[in-house]
Amino acid sequence: MRSASIILDSKALTHNLNCVIDTVPDTTKVLAMVKADAYGHGIAHCLPALKDADGLGVACFTEAQHIRELGWDKILVLIEGVFSETEWQQSIEAQCQSIIHHQDQVQWALNHLPPENSPCRTVWLKLNTGMNRLGFESDELGDVAQSLVDAGYELILTSHFANADAPNHPSNAKQIDTFTQALQQLREQVDPSIKASLCNSAGILNFKACHFDWVRPGIMLYGSSPVEGVSAQMLKLKPVMSFKASLMAIHNIAAGTSVGYGSRFVANRPIVKGIVSIGYGDGYPRVVDGSAWVSVQLAGEHSSYKCPVIGRVAMDMIAIDLTDVPNPKVGSQVMLWGDPELGAPSVDEIAESAHTLGYELLCRVTQRPLREVL
C-alpha cells in the first residue's frame, strides 16, 4: 500500500490552545478558528481537542452546519457573515452568531430578530481599520450600531490586522488607534456594554494590550508560527500535523545525469537518488526551491538524516539525494514536515522553500494521504 499519510497529534492541538488560554487574561474568551476544515487538519479530528475553547469561528454557514452535526453546542461564529437573507434565517435556526460587515446584512438582521434567549442576539460588527477588505468605515459605524442595539442586539466590535505578523509595521499602531477610538465612541454614545475583538494569532502574541473580550487564534493552534522571523519552537508551539511517506526506489546515478521533469536538476557528482511516494497530488508543494529537504529515518536507528529534495516535484513522486545516508533501504520512513525536535523540517521551513506560508500548505493537503489521529 502507498504509504503517504498525515499524522494528527490531538495533544499538540490542546497544548497550543492552552498556550493561548495562558497568554490572555482570564476575562478574555477564545474563539478558535477552524475554517477551511480546521486549516486542512479535519474538523472532525480536531473538535475533541478544542473542547475548552469558548467558541469556534468558521468562514461560512456550510462549515457551521457540519460542526453542529458533529455535536458542537457552544458559540459558533460566521466570520464572513451570511450571503443572503435566507441564510441569515438559517443561521438563527442553527444558533450561529455572525459578523455583519455591510448594510444588506444589517437589514436582514433587522428584518429577522432572533428569539430573546438566542445566542444569535449577539452580532459581531466589523470595522474597517486598515485591512481594507471588509467592514464599515468609522463615520458610518455609529448609525449601524445604534440601529442594531435599538432592535435588541448585543454587539461585539471586531476588526482584523493587516500586518500583525510584523509587529513594527506602522499600520498596526494606526489600526489599534482607529479601533480603540471607535470602541470608546460606541460605548459612550450607543451602549457601554459593547464588547471587542481585534487579535488574531499574531495579534495575541504581539499586542497583549489589545486582547479585549475575545481573541481569535488560528494558525498558532496548529503549531505554525504567525510571527515573522520567529519559529513555532521559539513560541513553544507544537506541530499538530506531520506529513510522511516512504522510499519507494533507490538508484545510483553518475555525474551529469538529470533527474525529473524538465531535467532541471543535473548531478554534479555521483549520487544516490531516492524516490519518495509523495507529490503535489498529496499536497506537497510543486514549487519548492533548492532549499527544501526531508528527514529520512532508517529502521532501528533513533537519529534521522537530512536529505535535499532534487528535481521537480511531480504529482505522485519526489526525488531526494540519499548520498549521505548510510545503507538506505526501500521502505524507510521519510518525513516531509513535522516536529523539528524529532529531526523533521517544520511546515514553515517547507513553506519558505515554496515561497508561501505554512497556512497554505496545511490547507492544501489533499484527501489522498491516509489520516492517523494520535
Curated annotation (Swiss-Prot):
Enzyme Commission no: 5.1.1.1
InterPro entries: Ala_racemase (IPR000821), Ala_racemase/Decarboxylase_C (IPR009006), Ala_racemase_C (IPR011079), Ala_racemase_N (IPR001608), PLP-binding_barrel (IPR029066)
Keywords: Isomerase, Pyridoxal phosphate
Gene Ontology molecular functions: alanine racemase activity; pyridoxal phosphate binding
One BP annotation, GO: D-alanine biosynthetic process
First-tier enzyme category under EC: isomerase
Protein name: Alanine racemase
Residues reported to bind substrate: 133, 315
NCBIfam families: alr (TIGR00492)
Catalytic activity, reaction form: L-alanine = D-alanine
Main function: Catalyzes the interconversion of L-alanine and D-alanine. May also act on other amino acids.
Organism, as annotated: Psychrobacter sp. (strain PRwf-1)
Active site positions: 35, 261
Gene3D superfamilies named among the record's database cross-references: Alanine racemase (3.20.20.10), Lyase, Ornithine Decarboxylase, Chain A, domain 1 (2.40.37.10)
